[in-house]
Amino acid sequence: MTNIFDTHAHYSSRQFDADRDAVMRALGEGGVVGVLECATHSGDAAAVLELAHKYPFVHAALGIHPESLGEEDAATVATYHGDWRAELAAMRPLFDDPAVIAVGEIGLDHHWPLPAQEQYDLFEAQLQLAQELDLPVSVHDREAHAEMYELLRQYRPRGVLHCYSGSAEDAAWLTAQGMALGFGGAVTYKGAKRAAKVLAMVPHELAVLETDCPYMSPEPVPVSYTHLTLPTIA
């Protein structure tokens, strides 16, 4: 398989520190023509941009992930002490870099004990930023469909709902609104019947591939090899 675009990845993760250059070369040699490299807070934005500047097929997305509200080593907590508004304001000039083509990874996560209202306000602020900059979004939605869909209906952003886990019914209106749906390693799991149903009914151009590396691998591939699995997922 050639001409692959990985629509959601984290190659700037520390897990790639030992062999990042080799991994990136392997991607280019393996038919990957594009990668959307996603930041999760201001602390990893520089590493994301460095990758995008070094490798022509890597494009950057900058944003504050909802989990960064509760991670002690994330800049949102470690540097800004939870003041995501100040952090987002400090990140604003970075969006002038032509390597930045999206706002992400942003969204809502109700799986972990994170402040719900702060998440909502942070996500809404970043949807507004994407609207202001006329950029697409890379969206994280974990166990937060109701609030997520409320804001997506309101702001109608372009972009990808990463690691889509919703129903076929919701997929219909999301794609009609112009959102693409991201599918990665989870579609290979034994319980992924809902994903199969969604994939059978959405337009092919709005069902996109992602690795979310190094965090999600298809069965039976070890997580450490997630970056090599796009053909397997497809």
Question: Residues of each region from the PLM?
Answer:
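Divalent metal-binding pocket/active-site signature
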Residues: T2-I4, A9-A22, G34-D44, E50, ...
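His/Asp/Glu-enriched short active-site or ligand-binding loop at hydrolase and phosphoryl-transfer sites
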Residues: G178-A192
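Surface-exposed, active-site-proximal loop segments in enzymatic domains
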Residues: L69-H81
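Non-cysteine beta-strand/loop elements that form the S-adenosyl-L-methionine
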Residues: A61-G63, I101-I106, L206-C213
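Structural detector of well-ordered beta-strand residues that form the stable sheet scaffold
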Residues: L36, H59-A61, S138, V160-H162, ...
